[in-house]
Amino acid sequence: MRHVSRTYGQDADEVHALTDVDLAVEAGSMVAVMGPSGSGKSTLLTIAGSLEEPTRGEVLIGGAALTTMSRNAKSRLRRRSIGYVFQDFNLLPGLTAAENVALPLELDGLSARKARIAGLKALDELGLGERAGNFPDQLSGGERQRVAIARAVVGDRRLLLADEPSGALDSVNGEAVMRLIHAACKRGVAAVVVTHDAQLASWADRVVFLRDGRVTDRTAPLPGPESLLSGEQNR
């Protein structure tokens, strides 16, 4: 992201969700984004993932500027190269957990058999192997969240965007999620993870703090959450 700003409304009602944000995420690295509610974290993710246009600035993925892409090209990019984990999960109710995870791979041309094998492996790594045949309404909130995460990391993604990926999970399952995201990064995926959890952020290579739509601090975390908490307090 280069000098990205996003405003909503006009004149007296104008709201600056993001202001002149610069953010670079290298392949194989994870960046955690922290900040209070309303600081612009979710807006940053939607713009980074080509789901929303910035008011000013540009977004590049793999060196290609999104502003120069056609609508169809952006759609292909989202389907093939970007994995999303948002707080509402967006699972298809008529598909099982395994089918939800495998669907993006099938849409990208992978055979149904290979897509299912990859999907089952991702679910198994998150402790959901025995729930693969269940529909979303048969799963708990935490289980649905893990299905959404499995769907986001499966396949040949280049960019993973996650909004509070451990928000509905206990500490054990939260760590399983971070291990899966970390494994994706080791395969060369670039990850941006929005979180309020310092323990989760300690997995990142770099932490960015947002406040009122502006980047206020950047740090490389030391092992463990204490360095993040003290870093935020000492800004």
Regions found by a protein language model. Name each.
Residues 2-206, 210:
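ABC family nucleotide-binding domain
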Residues 214-235:
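Conserved beta-strand-loop-alpha-helix hinge in the C-terminal portion
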